[in-house]
Amino acid sequence: MKRRDVIKTAGLALLGSVVAPIDSYSASTKSLNNAFNSDELNGVSNKRKLGMNLEVSSIGLGVQNMSRTYQTTIPSRTEMINIIRTAYDKGVTLFDAAVASGPFEVERILGDAVVPFRDKVVIETKFGWNIDQETGNRLPGLNSHPDHIKRVVEGMLKRLRTDRIDLLYQHRVDPQIPIEDVVGCIQDLIKEGKVLHYGLSEPGIKTVRRAHAIHPVTAIQNEYSLL
């Protein structure tokens, strides 16, 4: 597949996830089905390997706006679950969430949606913002203190209705906490079986190298708009 086709294909999938939450139930479902049925999306069932052994579909579905949109519309929970399950039926096995989205609520939606096929998909979610784990209130700055990470992961597991996070990202690098301490904490969670792989979002190259020296980094997530 040519680079232009890859971008166009991914753009169609992203369009389904971005537009669907603000449409009516029937319109958004039809739009998503049309996107995934497009001849240009034949590659959606192709697999990609992240790191050494994490296999995912070539296109993933982000659920960031499934609890609210930038237009402040509150989407239908039933509709959002249907979109996630439709994506799975069409070959998507990678689903991306974050504690900060909601906060908390998109993880709950995703957790409910994938119950019937949890062991057949990869869930990735993110920690790093300073969010009160009891109230969900967003506090100033970042928080990647190891004790906070552990509390956040426990909450993730409950909301996602799972016993492990397939791919855990640090949402933003915390300048107050050495990356070695962050990765050391994640390494402990991996040993406990609560996290299987980890990645970094928006890191600098030096941070990646320091992190990778402690434990292999599986994936890097950077801002790149296809639309």
Can you name each region flagged by the protein language model?
Residues 2-122:
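N-terminal binding-site loop/beta-alpha segment at the start of enzyme catalytic domains
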Residues 4, 44, 179-227:
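Beta/alpha (TIM)-barrel catalytic core signal, keyed to glycine-rich beta->alpha loops juxtaposed to Asp/Glu
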Residues 61, 95, 110, 123, ...:
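Conserved, mostly hydrophobic/aromatic
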Residues 64-66, 100, 126-130, 170-173, ...:
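Active-site beta-loop-alpha junctions enriched in small/polar residues
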Residues 74-86, 145-158, 208:
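Short, acidic/polar
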Residues 84, 107, 111, 153-154, ...:
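Generic structural signal for well-ordered alpha-helices
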Residues 98-106, 174-178, 226-227:
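Acidic-and-aromatic substrate-binding clefts and catalytic sites of carbohydrate-active enzymes
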Residues 158-174:
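Active-site groove signature of glycoside hydrolases
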